[in-house]
Amino acid sequence: MGSGRRALSAVPAVLLVLTLPGLPVWAQNDTEPIVLEGKCLVVCDSNPATDSKGSSSSPLGISVRAANSKVAFSAVRSTNHEPSEMSNKTRIIYFDQILVNVGNFFTLESVFVAPRKGIYSFSFHVIKVYQSQTIQVNLMLNGKPVISAFAGDKDVTREAATNGVLLYLDKEDKVYLKLEKGNLVGGWQYSTFSGFLVFPL
């Protein structure tokens, strides 16, 4: 028994346990099995930290991630005409067709609202059609530009302003695309805006 306990002490501090339906898990005294139904991902940490936004943590360092850690969206412009949505001078680039919206955190106004603190990935592809004026597209975080992309080749019928970034966001932070310079008179059909939660913090 003594050697067995010494062997257990050598187990790494981080363990992943995946239980299958009906699989018995034995108690520490090996007397009676504990039957767990369904699937459960358990992360053991020798130095646990309390997370009040989506994870529960015990003194033993066992943390179970909440379901709202799954966040993703992708939207596209499905028509090629100048819409009235941009006439309000906000210059927010509007996407009329939402392809993916896991968690429903991408609004009908084409603004993503972060549900929790974490690292998020964003990318965009805004097409300029049939006009020679250069456009500048900014990815905005709470009203401030973070990154930009440009499209301005006069000899190309269709050109795209494209960029991507990883961002640290707090809960309720807002991310959207803004047309900083130029216009989209010819429309921006097939333009896309996508994002997802890489991991929560």
Curated annotation (Swiss-Prot):
Under SMART domains, the record lists: C1Q (SM00110)
What keyword terms does UniProt attach to this protein? Disulfide bond, Glycoprotein, Secreted, Sialic acid, Signal, Synapse
* Sequence ranges assigned to domain C1q in this UniProt record: 66-201
Question: Which residues does the annotation flag as glycosylated?
Answer: 29, 88
Q: Which residues form the signal peptide?
A: 1-27
- Report the principal subcellular site: secreted
- Listed Gene3D superfamilies: 2.60.120.40
GO cellular component terms, A-Z: collagen-containing extracellular matrix; extracellular region; extracellular space; GABA-ergic synapse; glutamatergic synapse; synapse; synaptic cleft
Where does this polypeptide localize? Secreted; Synapse
Check the record and name the InterPro entries matching this protein. Answer: C1q_dom (IPR001073), Cerebellin_Synaptic_Org (IPR050822), Tumour_necrosis_fac-like_dom (IPR008983)
Entry comment on modification after translation? Sialoglycoprotein.
Annotated GO biological process:
inhibitory synapse assembly; protein secretion; trans-synaptic signaling, modulating synaptic transmission
Q: What does this protein do?
A: Acts as a synaptic organizer in specific subsets of neurons in the brain. Essential for the formation and maintenance of inhibitory GABAergic synapses. Promotes the development of dendrite-targeting inhibitory GABAergic synapses made by somatostatin-positive interneurons. May contribute to the function of ventral medial habenula region of the brain implicated in the regulation of anxiety-related behaviors. May play a role in CBLN3 export from the endoplasmic reticulum and secretion.
* Subunit architecture: Homohexamer; disulfide-linked homotrimers. The trimers are assembled via the globular C1q domains. The trimers associate via N-terminal cysteine residues to form disulfide-linked hexamers. May form oligomers with CBLN1, CBLN2 and CBLN3 prior to secretion. Strongly interacts with DCC in a NTN1-displaceable fashion. Weakly binds to NRXN1 and NRXN2 long and short isoforms produced by alternative promoter usage. Interaction with NRXN3 short isoform is hardly detectable; no interaction at all with NRXN3 long isoform.
Q: What is this protein called?
A: Cerebellin-4
What organism does the record attribute this protein to?
Homo sapiens (Human)
Q: Which gene encodes it?
A: CBLN4
